[in-house]
């Protein structure tokens, strides 16, 4: 049983904790919280011991929460650490704490790529993480792009270049201090956005350029992709690649999927925790072939898409299971859509 310590219990950390707890080959030995808020109390109710920094003990005790120990104690109690801290805090934790202990650490995409030995996506480069000390699961948008491109590559569809245009959600649903509210913001105004170079930390030979804007929504990101293929392929061949690839969902307008809100409503109707949708939601009707050019649109649920990647990263780093067995195990335990998917 792999003992997993989780540093940070926010949007990503709490989802990873729940996902790890659903596996039969790993368990959560504790989560690190900085603030004794409602999330800390929910973590306790879920059976996760709460750790914090030594100078925060009194605040937790006053809130009725008895800390199980310090961050150092949590690291010592763990076989592997998932760092789900806010952007740039992971690097600080590495320099201040992780380097003192011989424990592997998995960072998130908010950190720069050089915080880790390898950037990770389960479909694309699972094997590269084996035995690595520091691994970084790439961001939500990078994960979405990498999945889509890898689904083509795995099914023998060559890619000459990819141009991806991203409409980023302005904030997560709970982020009351972020925006925009009534604006469309170049994010950034320069080209490329960081997503293209980030994809290249995994798919190193891919010719890719990305552009991004931030829009006043909270539910999901939307990507609009132009992909030049290495040869002429039929639309059916491309659709079949998406159908077979795990963690990709094809949304049909005729079935009621007319917007990203319908994807989230579908997640709610499935009874998924927190209305999560870790799959990339490709609008089937948008998939268009013109010669060797492929066009498509797809949604990325920023709060949950990286969760299965973190579970697989744990097994990849520790060499517990080979790639496809881990991906299938994760998908089934998290109750992702597995019908028609090919694992191997």
From Swiss-Prot:
Catalytic activity annotation: D-glyceraldehyde 3-phosphate + phosphate + NADP(+) = (2R)-3-phospho-glyceroyl phosphate + NADPH + H(+); D-glyceraldehyde 3-phosphate + phosphate + NAD(+) = (2R)-3-phospho-glyceroyl phosphate + NADH + H(+)
Any Pfam family: Gp_dh_C
Main location: cytoplasm
Signal peptide (UniProt feature, chain positions): none
Binding site for NAD(+): 11-12, 110, 169, 302
GO cellular component annotations of the record: cytoplasm
Active site location: 140 (nucleophile)
Subcellular location per the Swiss-Prot or TrEMBL entry: Cytoplasm
Keywords: Cytoplasm, Glycolysis, NAD, NADP, Oxidoreductase
E.C. code: 1.2.1.59
PROSITE patterns associated with the record: GAPDH
Pathway: Carbohydrate degradation; glycolysis; pyruvate from D-glyceraldehyde 3-phosphate: step 1/5
HAMAP family linked: G3P_dehdrog_arch
Family membership noted in the UniProt record: Belongs to the glyceraldehyde-3-phosphate dehydrogenase family.
Protein name, as recorded: Glyceraldehyde-3-phosphate dehydrogenase
Classification of source organism: Archaea, Thermoproteota, Thermoprotei, Thermoproteales, Thermoproteaceae
């Amino acid at each position: 049983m792999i003992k997993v310590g989780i540093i940070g219990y926010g949007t990503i950390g709490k989802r990873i904790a729940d996902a790890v707890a659903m596996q039969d080959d790993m368990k959560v030995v504790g989560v690190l919280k900085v603030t004794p808020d409602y999330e800390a109390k929910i973590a306790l109710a879920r059976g996760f011991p709460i750790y914090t920094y030594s100078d925060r003990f009194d605040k937790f005790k006053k809130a009725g929460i008895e800390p199980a120990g310090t961050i150092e104690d949590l690291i010592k109690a763990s076989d592997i650490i998932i760092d789900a801290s806010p952007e740039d805090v992971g690097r600080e934790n590495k320099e201040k704490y992780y380097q003192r202990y011989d424990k592997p650490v998995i960072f998130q995409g908010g950190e720069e790529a050089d915080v880790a030995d390898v950037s990770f996506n389960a479909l694309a480069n699972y094997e590269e993480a084996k035995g690595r000390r520091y691994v970084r699961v790439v961001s939500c948008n990078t994960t979405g792009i990498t999945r889509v491109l890898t689904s083509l590559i795995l099914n023998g569809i060559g890619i000459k270049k990819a141009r991806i245009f991203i409409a980023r959600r302005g904030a997560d649903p709970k982020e009351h201090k972020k925006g925009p509210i009534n604006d469309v913001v170049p994010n950034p105004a320069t080209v490329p956005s960081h997503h293209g170079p980030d994809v290249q930390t995994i798919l190193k030979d891919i010719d890719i350029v990305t552009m991004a804007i931030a829009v006043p929504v909270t539910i999901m990101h939307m990507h609009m992709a132009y992909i030049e293929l290495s040869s002429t392929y039929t639309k059916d061949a491309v659709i079949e690649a998406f159908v077979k690839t795990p963690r990709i969902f094809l949304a049909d307008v005729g079935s009621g999927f007319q917007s990203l809100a319908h994807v989230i409503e579908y997640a709610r109707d499935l009874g998924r925790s927190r209305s999560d949708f870790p799959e990339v939601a490709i609008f089937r009707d948008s998939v268009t072939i013109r010669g060797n050019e492929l066009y498509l649109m797809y949604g990325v649920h920023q709060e949950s898409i990286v969760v299965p990647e973190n579970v697989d990263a744990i097994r990849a780093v520790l060499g517990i299971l080979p790639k496809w067995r881990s991906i299938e195990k994760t998908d089934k335990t998290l109750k992702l859509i597995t019908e028609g998917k090919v694992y191997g």
